[in-house]
Amino acid sequence: MEDDDEASRIIEAVLDSSARFGIPLYIETHRATIFQDIWRTVQFIRKHPDVRVNGDFSHWYTGQEFVYGGFEAKMQFIEPVLERVRFLHGRIGNPGSIQVDIGEDEAPYIGHFRALWTRSMEHFLRQASPGDFLCFVPELLSPRIYYGRVFRDAGGELREESDRWTQSLVLRKIAQDCFVKAQTLSDSAIGGRA
């Protein structure tokens, strides 16, 4: 609910605290926050280029309907955000839900998350200094807080759609694949500049 001036003061406070205490602080791409939509986030990044981001892209993917209106155009628009990601929340959503069971990595929208994560990782690798780190943390939340979906089983009982532990392992594998691809892209870009 913050207007742009209030949000800028929050961003400045985050940047000041991070510098003063030597602790990396990341602003999350999350609904109902100052970085809830791609337009506003990119504008704030332009105004505050030192911001570093926690990319929880499932909120944008579902809330901003990333599958409609040209996914690659949206990727290009959010490039300034992807350049600043230093923490990734590993959750995959679809056009209708922020957190879904992705099976064994076969759902069609997974490719979009692979692209978001790979590009974020590639930017990190190109900019990283010795000792820098990028966190990838699966974040699969409970139906009790309206993230994990529930459906009735054959007996009529409500059951959570997925096993969050198993899904975390799938997300971890996807992230590892993305990191390997990002390393290849980063290495070839650096080699091309040499």
Language-model regions, residue ranges each:
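Active-site acidic/histidine proton-transfer and metal-coordination neighborhood
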Residues: 1-53
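Active-site glycine-centered loops adjacent to acidic/histidine catalytic or metal-binding residues
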Residues: 56
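Histidine-acidic metal/acid-base catalytic patches
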Residues: 42, 47-52, 61-194
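Generic low-polarity alpha-helical segments
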Residues: 29-31, 59, 88
